[in-house]
Amino acid sequence: MSKSTAEIRQAFLDFFHSKGHQVVASSSLVPHNDPTLLFTNAGMNQFKDVFLGLDKRNYSRATTSQRCVRAGGKHNDLENVGYTARHHTFFEMLGNFSFGDYFKHDAIQFAWELLTSEKWFALPKERLWVTVYESDDEAYEIWEKEVGIPRERIIRIGDNKGAPYASDNFWQMGDTGPCGPCTEIFYDHGDHIWGGPPGSPEEDGDRYIEIWNIVFMQFNRQADGTMEPLPKPSVDTGMGLERIAAVLQHVNSNYDIDLFRTLIQAVAKVTGATDLSNKSLRVIADHIRSCAFLIADGVMPSNENRGYVLRRIIRRAVRHGNMLGAKETFFYKLVGPLIDVMGSAGEDLKRQQAQVEQVLKTEEEQFARTLERGLALLDEELAKLSGDTLDGETAFRLYDTYGFPVDLTADVCRERNIKVDEAGFEAAMEEQRRRAREASGFGADYNAMIRVDSASEFKGYDHLELNGKVTALFVDGKAVDAINAGQEAVVVLDQTPFYAESGGQVGDKGELKGANFSFAVEDTQKYGQAIGHIGKLAAGSLKVGDAVQADVDEARRARIRLNHSATHLMHAALRQVLGTHVSQKGSLVNDKVLRFDFSHNEAMKPEEIRAVEDLVNAQIRRNLPIETNIMDLEAAKAKGAMALFGEKYDERVRVLSMGDFSTELCGGTHASRTGDIGLFRIISESGTAAGVRRIEAVTGEGAIATVHADSERLSEVAHLLKGDSNNLADKVRSVLERTRQLEKELQQLKEQAAAQESANLSSKAIDVNGVKLLVSELSGVEPKMLRTMVDDLKNQLGSTIIVLATVAEGKVSLIAGVSKDVTDRVKAGELIGMVAQQVGGKGGGRPDMAQAGGTDAAALPAALASVKGWVSAKLQ
């Protein structure tokens, strides 16, 4: 009996654990502190800083099953998903990694043992082929002489992409930085499937399938293209879980493995589909994986960046559901079946199931409305069309803005004997792809990044003042031996009380000083295991090896500590008041305010905000002890400690507890007891994205200051109303009622004046071919009164065409009215458009009534003068 996908995942991890590898959990799909990458798309992403020498781990071997998304940016598989055997938006990458530990020999031997040993995957050796980089004789000889693969199944691949080192078998992180040759392992499905071995003209067939890529990072590529050997060569490997599952389960398509068969059946059930071979079922089964895990990792549908990619995937899935005949929202119903089929890899998703389902349902409902708006826009564009072809830009705008598939656009056009410029659509699509490619991938010059080999010991939990030694200095990213007065720099110390920005808490400010120098610290950041003090040397000079006294700005740190502790209390209070679906999606803690983003699908009610505020202040009055304990990550999770969104954790973590009320993983600085916070006040609650709310709050002196400010405002209002704070509401109600009465009286007077003006105007109408034409610019008339005047004039004049204009604050307001018996010859929308164009504006409306605005008041007299000639031509 073949292994299930879940069993294959576990077997891979178990094998490498038996070889001394640390099993590391999958990182978030949102790359941590990496603006160069749209989504996590490979197992090595979370170890990138380790490979670059910017970070150190307490292990030199690691293995993972990493969740990955490739949709948008350089790795955009979206269009092919569902229509090929192996394209996915979401996949799991099995990997083993060596950070300066073992190299080619062990990496190849490990791979061969796992794949062919009867104890593990037991693949037939004769079905395995390998490729190596053309000049990598070492890897070639290991495969041939040690593993024993015949020469005819070892293929050398050269620079097959048009440039030196541009090869399928040479991996590069970017234009500069770590790189090296790779060896790939292929599985031969047999001669009943078309295709040739790698490097042959038939290599794109499905017979020979790459299952494992083993990268040997042994060079550091310089800006001039030269390759310098790395002092500690490393290994990075990747094997797609879905691909190896297909091989081990004896199927040719990833969509035929147990995981996808189960999901496809679930899709068929919720959509009512009966043909299990329909490609749309595969599309939806793939897309629920990427969408659900992206939302669980904090991405929300939006019109930009990661949220935009998520929205496109959701809409593609929903459209395919509609093609299958789904009559109601269905996509969110697949989250439960997905959790079931993912096994242990779905635990994070299970904790957020309700939130993920709600976001998907809301987005699907919104798309239904978007589809209607897209159809309306298409109708407008077709109405304006003069030829028989809809331009590609418009078709692309319908697709890009409204999620409108081009084939649906073509169907609507076909009914009206109109073609779609599909070549123009493809050109616009390719331009978008080009922009996406430029905006993604490892494009940075990593040799310009700060590399610190030393580590800094943080002692800021217990000290705000400490003596240390300068271990490194950096100016403009480059290491220097000394700096002089006036220079901006990053100073690294062997030990420091300064907290480096992390977990939402900003870095400390303060001063580094000595007998003859003073360095003002404006920020503190992490550089791998080192802590960098960023600022400017105010006086003297400073060199590597100097002793310094590090003084943190104590008052600022104290305010930050209160805000950070209050953030933890508020998080726990939100979960009590709103529900356990609340999870942190981001935070900012500085000395002035705390900002907290969390999952919740609607605006908080005033009574909910008050309840959270009251609950936090109750815990402050309890004066609970705030305690920290260092423990294993798994033990902390078992204790119920909540983790911060987007934060990386070591195997040993710091657990912060506030009595029995809150327990979270946190490396930040905090008050000693909750009572130190003094007072907590929420100052705003707003939405940042679908399903994400944001609270801003203040504590301590900041909270007291808001109380004083509110009191002063109330006193000022009371003084203006000649009352006091006790009867202020009654006074305001009285003033509002009097204001409403006066506004009503004023409106009546305006309407009377407009009626009188209309009566005066009617006498100015002229006859044009039996139709009364009235064109007039009015002064002192509000734009909103023009419509009333046109209605009055229509009643007075009978068969008529009316154009009225007024200018207020430099802006032109126009209205055109046409009696219904004339609309077959003159349409108000066309007339107003002609006038508006001359005054720098645009507008539209019904055939009998249309409005417009403009910005060029000086051009108004000439524009109005042109009406008579235009109307005369229409009435001939």
From Swiss-Prot:
Instruction: Report the InterPro entries cross-referenced here.
Output: aa-tRNA-synth_II/BPL/LPL (IPR045864), Ala-tRNA-lgiase_IIc (IPR002318), Ala-tRNA-ligase_IIc_anticod-bd (IPR018162), Ala-tRNA-synth_IIc_core (IPR018165), Ala-tRNA-synth_IIc_N (IPR018164), Ala-tRNA_ligase (IPR050058), Ala_tRNA_ligase_euk/bac (IPR023033), DHHA1_dom (IPR003156)
Q: Which residues carry this modification: N6-acetyllysine?
A: K74
PANTHER family found in the cross-reference section: ALANINE--TRNA LIGASE, CYTOPLASMIC, ALANYL-TRNA SYNTHETASE
Tell me the protein family, please: Belongs to the class-II aminoacyl-tRNA synthetase family.
Q: How does it assemble?
A: Homotetramer.
Q: Name the PROSITE patterns for this protein.
A: AA_TRNA_LIGASE_II_ALA (PS50860)
Kindly list the cofactors needed.
Answer: Zn(2+)
Question: This protein is called what?
Answer: Alanine--tRNA ligase
- Which organism does this sequence originate in? Escherichia coli O6:K15:H31 (strain 536 / UPEC)
This protein's record includes keyword Ligase? yes
